[in-house]
């Protein structure tokens, strides 16, 4: 195999003593500059050939029920959502009245790592277009993101940004898409029919100023339709953050005949792998222990995202226990319990998480893990990263105003009343 020197475009002489190594250059290496942007969908947002292992940050489908752990919803007026068991999806429905609305948003935001392409895909079927009906699907929140919108009879790709201090939506009409208008006369020859099920994709090279490609997957092929460019064009950043959520909206902006949108699947993928970074913090009970009541799940440590920081990314990583009596203890990990009593504190002002080690009760929620340990014995730390990855990321409801996030709680039940336990919990904050 000949060896090629890229710097001067020559081949090296054959030398049997040299090892010959195949190298695949990045998708943009030595390529001609294309003013309209990177149109090669076999390359990621940064032009790297898509041969690297994708790392799934989020995936959602509806095989047996509504996935309430992954999704939060807000219903206004006569709006409703219903699990469709035959089709394995969610039917989002609004009535005829102005103001009826369904909003479905993932309960987590997803970590963007600078220098790595972030690929987002959502599948759906829109309701037939009509006057006063607005439908949105994409990767966005109240403040920032990119999404597809059908408003009245018109179709747009929209960039939402709060970098100016106010929320500004920049809609690009289908007739103005800069790559393929999907009107049958574009490079793909495809005509977009939003009454049929679609796969919407977008990939981000954020870094604050990168490009965002948007498009559809048709017949197994990624078709780019519009690229939002920013580098060498803007001052500052184009959105506040690329760590956002998947979101679906169905809204009556006036009186309509009623409508149903179908929410199917979503995924968020870090292309080129993912390495969890960020500062770890921890909280623990006093060395004298937390006094437990028998026949009760005692909340020894709880976490939640702070008010104003609920789009942060924080993941519990490690738990340790020590029982002060030589008896058995049972512990549970509970998401979204209602915590009463105690004081919420934070380790330092830069932290996005607050903790409570003096709460009185934990009611409801979902038990995601439970086990036992013996007091007055060495208990190996429980490495949550190994068992759950990022699945325990702290969640929140749909953000409409500053509010605290949902809870993550460790409860302990003793063998005997007034037994004592010491627990510690370490978490990692991936946004700062």
Where are these regions (language model features)?
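Extracellular/lumenal carbohydrate-interaction signature centered on repeated Trp-anchored short motifs
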Residues: 109-120, 189-196, 401
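Secretory/extracellular carbohydrate-interaction modules
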Residues: 92-170, 304-312, 318-345
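Glycine-aromatic-enriched beta-strand/loop faces of beta-sandwich-type recognition domains
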Residues: 134-197, 367-378, 383
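C-terminal interaction-tip segments
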Residues: 130-152, 219-224, 403-406, 412-432
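Noncatalytic modules at the cell exterior or secretory-pathway interfaces
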Residues: 240-250, 317-319, 396-417
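Extended, solvent-exposed segments with strong compositional bias
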Residues: 352-396
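Extended, low-complexity segments enriched in Ser/Thr/Gly and acidic residues that occur primarily
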Residues: 1-74, 275-327
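Aromatic sugar-binding interfaces of carbohydrate-active proteins
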Residues: 147, 192-194, 201-287
């Amino acid at each position: 195999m000949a060896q090629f020197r890229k710097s001067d475009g020559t081949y090296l002489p054959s030398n049997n003593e040299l090892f010959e190594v195949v190298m695949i250059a990045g998708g943009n290496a030595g390529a001609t500059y294309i003013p309209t942007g990177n149109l090669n969908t076999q390359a990621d947002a940064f032009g790297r050939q898509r041969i690297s292992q994708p790392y799934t940050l989020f995936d959602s489908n509806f095989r047996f029920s509504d996935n309430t752990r992954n999704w939060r919803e807000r219903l206004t007026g006569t709006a409703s959502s219903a699990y469709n068991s035959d089709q394995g999806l969610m039917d989002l429905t609004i009535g005829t009245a102005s103001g009826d609305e369904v909003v479905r948003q993932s309960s987590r935001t997803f970590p963007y790592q600078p220098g790595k392409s972030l690929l987002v895909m959502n599948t759906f079927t829109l309701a037939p277009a009509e006057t006063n009906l607005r439908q949105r699907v994409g990767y966005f929140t109240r403040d920032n993101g990119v999404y597809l919108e059908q408003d009245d009879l018109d179709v747009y790709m929209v960039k939402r940004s709060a970098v100016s201090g106010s929320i500004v939506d920049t809609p690009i009409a289908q007739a103005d898409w800069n790559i393929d208008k999907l009107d049958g006369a574009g490079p793909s020859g495809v005509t977009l029919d939003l009454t049929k099920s679609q796969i919407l994709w977008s990939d981000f090279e954020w870094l604050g100023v990168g490009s965002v490609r948007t498009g559809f997957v048709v017949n197994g092929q990624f078709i780019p339709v519009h690229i939002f460019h920013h580098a060498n064009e803007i001052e500052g950043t184009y959105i506040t953050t690329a760590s956002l959520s998947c979101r679906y909206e169905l809204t009556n902006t006036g009186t309509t005949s009623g409508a149903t949108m179908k929410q199917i699947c979503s995924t968020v993928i870090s292309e080129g792998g993912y390495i969890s970074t960020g500062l770890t913090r921890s909280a623990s009970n006093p060395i004298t222990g937390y006094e437990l009541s028998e026949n009760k799940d005692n909340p020894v440590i709880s976490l939640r995202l702070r008010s104003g920081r609920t789009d942060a990314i924080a993941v519990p990583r490690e738990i340790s226990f020590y029982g002060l009596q030589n008896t058995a203890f049972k512990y549970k990990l509970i998401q979204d319990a209602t915590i009463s009593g105690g004081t919420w504190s934070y380790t330092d002002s830069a932290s996005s998480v607050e903790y409570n080690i003096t709460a009185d009760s934990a009611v409801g929620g979902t038990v995601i893990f439970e086990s036992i340990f013996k007091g007055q014995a060495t208990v190996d730390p429980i490495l949550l990263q190994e068992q759950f990855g990022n699945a325990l990321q702290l969640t929140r409801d749909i953000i409409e105003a500053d509010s605290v996030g949902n809870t993550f709680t460790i409860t302990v039940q003793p063998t005997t009343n007034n037994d004592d336990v010491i627990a510690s919990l370490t978490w990692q904050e991936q946004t700062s």
